[in-house]
């Protein structure tokens, strides 16, 4: 019954042994490529600098090749015959001959500078030119310039070879990386920290004192083992954290990592299994090999149910790889070889699907339940998360803790964060009770939307929600009403009647039959109000969620809690889902068809009785309902104390409700 109503890559270590020659050769080539581009610390160049050098070389080559051609395209040219004609005409004043380049630069009369000299392509033997130069008494000078053609050719060839080598090394590096990835499939993906700095200590964990004490003992054993070994105690090999989502299992693991001061490996259960056969088992072996090298240490496996589920037929036959991984995990945890100094901490919210061999002492010696926090736990969690929040003096963490039974630690943290966001949005200096109430509504029900404008629809929703609220106020075993509103919420919620849950009952899980029956009656109050006020033809689908929860609760009362005329019999397994590793046989009903008919009859009888009771109460208080509807349409929200005062004017309240009104009057 306790579960009713609850919603329940630091890099890998370096070093690979036993590689074949080809792999070593590939790695050597890859290393050269990495050194070239600065990927390893041993390289003299950084990667960016390597690429800059390559780009500079290519640009320089282009400049050297293009600049002469560009320069030549801007100069004035003369043919050899034109040069002879101009010499004969007496227009040439000076000739500079460059035999290594096979050209001559010619100055004509009227030129002011040597920059405008004409270029003439010369032949090897020019005797007639020399004769005419002597005859015309032209200045002729033989220029000796270095021959750069050979050097240019060498540079050009070197650059081409360099580019080809760079491209080949890049291709080789990529291929070797892909080959290395394939070979690294069997390596563990666990994140390793020599001294984990998670930023979380045990003082940051609140609300789960019993679980924290168990794990603090493990940390003490790692820090001071002689304290325990002196009296013959052995350190637990494994600790399994069990509890609903959001209760702080992973937070506890972070606190252990921050407090232990020993090497810490963390991995998710889903990271063991891949599509390739044998990869999971190989990763388990590699993980424990690294752990042994760093013992004493801690291995944290989050969501271990992903790899540790019950072995068996299950659905289909595609779970051999997972079973092989689990077998290897069982062997490493408590097999032929010991793992002294290695503590395994795992977390799951589905312990019922874990293999029994995984849960036995010697593997997981301790199972620590991290349950939803009670009042004191919620208060401690609120104090931790309120440290960095600006709260106004009227905020009472004790009152908030009493308003939030059934909240997990994650829910409380999210609620305070939503309150802080609302405060900033409303431009207030501190969080007030209004922001807290709105944040609780947002977390539990949904985002507040624009109020309805349609009069008929608004009135129908008002009657529906007041049907819940009126029954909540008049039934003697029900919870107290906190407020009723017709402001719509996200997710299709047109309004709601919010109860103040009995924290003692919620925290203990000890739900009474009277409370459960009244809960069914209250859930049917909305549909009953629609039918009584508007008639059967105007009944809407707004009660769909209510009817679904009623059917589920009534079936649990008959088949699990033994609260029907069938007697105290548990007729159904509480876990109705079929999991891998759980065969269909375990899901077959454990009763005959005749008993199944009786179960259906008991459920129908219980629900119909509650429905008729709800209709009767609404029918007898029709005048009160009409007044409350007008008030609710006007104000859109009625607080619980005001609602009880109005109801008390028309009818007598149950003892619990009446005592609350008397208390409010005294205040």
Swiss-Prot record:
<keyword id="KW-0472">Membrane</keyword>
<dbReference type="GO" id="GO:0008270">
    <property type="term" value="F:zinc ion binding"/>
</dbReference>
<dbReference type="GO" id="GO:0030163">
    <property type="term" value="P:protein catabolic process"/>
</dbReference>
<keyword id="KW-0482">Metalloprotease</keyword>
<dbReference type="GO" id="GO:0006508">
    <property type="term" value="P:proteolysis"/>
</dbReference>
<dbReference type="Pfam" id="PF01434">
    <property type="entry name" value="Peptidase_M41"/>
</dbReference>
<dbReference type="InterPro" id="IPR003960">
    <property type="entry name" value="ATPase_AAA_CS"/>
</dbReference>
<dbReference type="InterPro" id="IPR011546">
    <property type="entry name" value="Pept_M41_FtsH_extracell"/>
</dbReference>
<feature type="transmembrane region" description="Helical">
    <location>
        <begin position="152"/>
        <end position="172"/>
    </location>
</feature>
<keyword id="KW-0793">Thylakoid</keyword>
<dbReference type="InterPro" id="IPR000642">
    <property type="entry name" value="Peptidase_M41"/>
</dbReference>
<feature type="topological domain" description="Cytoplasmic">
    <location>
        <begin position="173"/>
        <end position="667"/>
    </location>
</feature>
<feature type="topological domain" description="Lumenal">
    <location>
        <begin position="72"/>
        <end position="151"/>
    </location>
</feature>
<feature type="active site">
    <location>
        <position position="465"/>
    </location>
</feature>
<dbReference type="Pfam" id="PF00004">
    <property type="entry name" value="AAA"/>
</dbReference>
<dbReference type="InterPro" id="IPR003959">
    <property type="entry name" value="ATPase_AAA_core"/>
</dbReference>
<dbReference type="GO" id="GO:0016887">
    <property type="term" value="F:ATP hydrolysis activity"/>
</dbReference>
<dbReference type="InterPro" id="IPR003593">
    <property type="entry name" value="AAA+_ATPase"/>
</dbReference>
<comment type="function">
    <text>Acts as a processive, ATP-dependent zinc metallopeptidase for both cytoplasmic and membrane proteins. Plays a role in the quality control of integral membrane proteins.</text>
</comment>
<feature type="binding site">
    <location>
        <begin position="243"/>
        <end position="250"/>
    </location>
    <ligand>
        <name>ATP</name>
    </ligand>
</feature>
<dbReference type="Pfam" id="PF17862">
    <property type="entry name" value="AAA_lid_3"/>
</dbReference>
<dbReference type="Pfam" id="PF06480">
    <property type="entry name" value="FtsH_ext"/>
</dbReference>
<feature type="topological domain" description="Cytoplasmic">
    <location>
        <begin position="1"/>
        <end position="50"/>
    </location>
</feature>
<dbReference type="GO" id="GO:0005524">
    <property type="term" value="F:ATP binding"/>
</dbReference>
<feature type="binding site">
    <location>
        <position position="468"/>
    </location>
    <ligand>
        <name>Zn(2+)</name>
    </ligand>
</feature>
<feature type="binding site">
    <location>
        <position position="464"/>
    </location>
    <ligand>
        <name>Zn(2+)</name>
    </ligand>
</feature>
<keyword id="KW-1133">Transmembrane helix</keyword>
<dbReference type="GO" id="GO:0004176">
    <property type="term" value="F:ATP-dependent peptidase activity"/>
</dbReference>
<keyword id="KW-0812">Transmembrane</keyword>
<keyword id="KW-0862">Zinc</keyword>
<keyword id="KW-0378">Hydrolase</keyword>
<dbReference type="InterPro" id="IPR041569">
    <property type="entry name" value="AAA_lid_3"/>
</dbReference>
<feature type="transmembrane region" description="Helical">
    <location>
        <begin position="51"/>
        <end position="71"/>
    </location>
</feature>
<dbReference type="InterPro" id="IPR037219">
    <property type="entry name" value="Peptidase_M41-like"/>
</dbReference>
<feature type="binding site">
    <location>
        <position position="546"/>
    </location>
    <ligand>
        <name>Zn(2+)</name>
    </ligand>
</feature>
<protein>
    <recommendedName>
        <fullName>ATP-dependent zinc metalloprotease FtsH</fullName>
        <ecNumber>3.4.24.-</ecNumber>
    </recommendedName>
</protein>
<comment type="similarity">
    <text>In the central section; belongs to the AAA ATPase family.</text>
</comment>
<dbReference type="InterPro" id="IPR027417">
    <property type="entry name" value="P-loop_NTPase"/>
</dbReference>
<dbReference type="GO" id="GO:0031676">
    <property type="term" value="C:plasma membrane-derived thylakoid membrane"/>
</dbReference>
<dbReference type="InterPro" id="IPR005936">
    <property type="entry name" value="FtsH"/>
</dbReference>
<comment type="similarity">
    <text>In the C-terminal section; belongs to the peptidase M41 family.</text>
</comment>
<comment type="subunit">
    <text>Homohexamer.</text>
</comment>
């Amino acid at each position: 019954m306790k579960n009713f109503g609850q919603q329940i890559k630091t890099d890998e270590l370096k070093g690979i042994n036993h590689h074949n020659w080809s792999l070593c050769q590939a790695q050597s080539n890859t290393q050269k490529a990495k050194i070239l581009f600065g990927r390893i610390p041993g390289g003299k160049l950084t990667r960016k600098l390597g690429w800059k050098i390559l780009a500079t070389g290519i640009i320089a080559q282009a400049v050297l090749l293009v600049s002469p051609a560009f320069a030549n395209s801007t100069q004035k040219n003369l043919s050899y015959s034109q040069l002879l004609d101009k010499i004969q005409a007496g227009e040439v004043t000076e000739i500079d001959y460059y035999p290594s380049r096979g050209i001559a630069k010619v100055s004509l009369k009227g030129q002011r500078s040597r920059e405008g000299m004409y270029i003439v392509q010369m032949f090897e033997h020019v005797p007639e030119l020399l004769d005419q130069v002597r005859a015309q008494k032209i200045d002729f000078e033989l220029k000796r310039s270095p021959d750069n053609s050979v050097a240019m050719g060498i540079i050009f060839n070197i650059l081409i070879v360099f580019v080809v080598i760079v491209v080949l090394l890049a291709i080789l590096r990529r291929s070797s990386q892909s080959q290395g990835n394939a070979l690294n499939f069997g390596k563990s993906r666990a994140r390793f920290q020599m001294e984990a700095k998670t930023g979380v200590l045990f003082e940051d964990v609140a609300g789960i004192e019993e679980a924290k004490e168990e794990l603090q003992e493990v940390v003490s054993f790692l820090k001071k083992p002689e304290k325990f070994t002196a009296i013959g105690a052995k350190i637990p090999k494994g600790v399994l954290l069990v509890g609903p989502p959001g209760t702080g299992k992973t937070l506890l693991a972070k606190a252990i990592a921050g407090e232990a001061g020993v090497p810490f490996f963390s991995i998710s259960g889903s990271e063991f299994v891949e599509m390739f056969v044998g990869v999971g088992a190989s990763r388990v072996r590699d993980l424990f090999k690294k752990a042994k090298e760093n013992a004493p240490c801690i291995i944290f496996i989050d969501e271990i149910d992903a790899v540790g589920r019950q072995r068996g037929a299950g659905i289909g036959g595609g779970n051999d790889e997972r079973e092989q991984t689990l077998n290897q995990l069982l062997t490493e945890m408590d097999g032929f070889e010991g793992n002294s100094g290695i503590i395994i901490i795992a977390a799951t919210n589905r312990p019922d699907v874990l293999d029994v061999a995984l849960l036995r002492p010697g593997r997981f010696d301790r199972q620590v339940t991290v349950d939803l926090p009670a009042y004191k736990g919620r208060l401690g969690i609120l104090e931790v998360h309120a440290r960095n929040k600006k709260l106004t003096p009227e905020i009472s963490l004790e009152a908030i803790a009493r308003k939030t039974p059934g909240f997990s630690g994650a829910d409380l943290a999210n609620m305070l964060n939503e309150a802080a966001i609302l405060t900033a949005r409303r431009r207030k200096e501190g969080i007030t009770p209004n922001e807290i109430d709105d944040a609780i509504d947002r977390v539990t029900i949904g985002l507040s939307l624009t109020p309805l404008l349609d009069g008929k629809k608004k009135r129908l929703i008002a009657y529906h929600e007041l049907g819940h609220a009126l029954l909540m106020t008049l039934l003697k075993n029900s919870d107290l009403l906190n407020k009723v509103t017709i402001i719509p919420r996200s997710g299709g919620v047109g309004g709601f009647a919010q109860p103040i849950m009995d924290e003692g009952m919620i925290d203990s899980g000890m739900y009474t039959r009277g409370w459960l029956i009244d809960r069914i009656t209250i859930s049917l109050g909305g549909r009953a109000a629609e039918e009584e006020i508007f008639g059967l033809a105007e009944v809407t689908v707004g009660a769909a969620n209510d009817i679904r929860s009623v059917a589920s609760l009534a079936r649990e009362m008959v088949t699990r809690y033994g609260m029907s005329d069938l007697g105290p019999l548990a007729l159904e397994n509480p876990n109705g889902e079929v999991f891998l590793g759980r065969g269909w046989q375990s899901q077959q009903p454990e009763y005959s068809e005749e008993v199944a008919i009786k179960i259906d009859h008991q459920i129908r009888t219980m629900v119909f009785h509650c429905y008729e009771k709800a209709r009767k109460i609404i029918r007898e208080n029709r005048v009160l309902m009409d007044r409350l509807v007008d008030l609710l349409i006007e104000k859109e929200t009625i607080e619980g104390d005001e609602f009880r005062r109005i109801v008390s004017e028309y009818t007598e309240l149950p003892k619990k409700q009446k005592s609350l009104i008397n208390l409010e009057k005294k205040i």
